[in-house]
Amino acid sequence: MAKEENKGSEQSGSDWKQFIYNPQKGEFMGRTASSWALILLFYLVFYGFLAGLFTLTMWVMLQTLDDSVPKYRDRVSSPGLMISPKSAGLEIKFSRSKTQSYMEYVQTLNTFLAPYNDSIQAKNEFCPPGLYFDQDEEVEKKTCQFNRTSLGICSGIEDPMFGYGEGKPCVIVKINRIIGLKPEGNPKINCTSKTEDVNLQYFPDNGKIDLMYFPYYGKKTHVNYVQPVVAVKISPSNFTSEEIAVECKIHGSRNLKNEDERDKFLGRVTFKVKITE
């Protein structure tokens, strides 16, 4: 019985060896050299054809795209709003007596407003207010000046602490960029707070967003563009450590939406400020 098992094992091993290489027929794993060559040639041609077809398809598709402007823009017809400094949960918390508690906010604002410095904006165009700055035919797009000094006491020039040291912080409300957007009417940022005895002051006056900063032509062609912003100074009448909820919306333009239950940042932004002694 043991001899029969050994004989079976030897036979099985011999069959495997013969399958891997059969010297009598000149076969490797059941195929001759010419058979393997034909199979390899077939797959080489087949996958080469697929790669060529994919490359051709991608090339044709890329010919239909503009390097500077997205092909499909109909799904983003109205811009969203965001604030600076942007913190986790859009909650700004600090103690006015502890400099370290708000220095990160101050540094963020300085970094954000650096491109708005008057020395940099002097290189841009002085544009007539209230008019679109159309440049469809221009290859190199120019930019209208938006000077940092127009943000008044929220510019960080008069008060390097942006009001945080006195417990009256400044928050920058910015509009997200959309290529080709032309707001109608007289757009402006308007903010409200449910907390009583809170004064909101805007820079520029009335939270105005001038039309001369539109349209935007894209990052690649509109190199020096800076979007218009509105600074909001939040001045509570007392410091009770109560959380101040502020909601800012775009108003005054019928083609800019500010209400959408599916997108809480479409034309609006809500943030909270908590100030302690």
Swiss-Prot record:
Compartments it resides in: Cell membrane
Keywords: Cell membrane, Disulfide bond, Glycoprotein, Ion transport, Membrane, Potassium, Potassium transport, Signal-anchor, Sodium, Sodium transport, Sodium/potassium transport, Transmembrane, Transmembrane helix, Transport
Expression sites by tissue: Nervous system specific.
UniProt topological domain (Cytoplasmic) ranges: 1-35
Single biological process term from Gene Ontology: intracellular potassium ion homeostasis
Membrane topology: Single-pass type II membrane protein
Extracellular side: 57-277
Keyword Transit peptide in record: no
One MF annotation (Gene Ontology) recorded for this entry: ATPase activator activity
Predominant localisation class: membrane
Residues spanning the membrane: 36-56
Residues bearing glycans: N117, N147, N190, N238
Functional description taken from the UniProt entry: This is the non-catalytic component of the active enzyme, which catalyzes the hydrolysis of ATP coupled with the exchange of Na(+) and K(+) ions across the plasma membrane. The exact function of the beta-3 subunit is not known.
UniProt cross-references to PANTHER family, sorted A to Z: SODIUM/POTASSIUM-DEPENDENT ATPASE BETA SUBUNIT, SODIUM_POTASSIUM-TRANSPORTING ATPASE SUBUNIT BETA-3
Protein's UniProt name: Sodium/potassium-transporting ATPase subunit beta-3
Protein species of origin: Xenopus laevis (African clawed frog)
Gene from which this protein is expressed: atp1b3
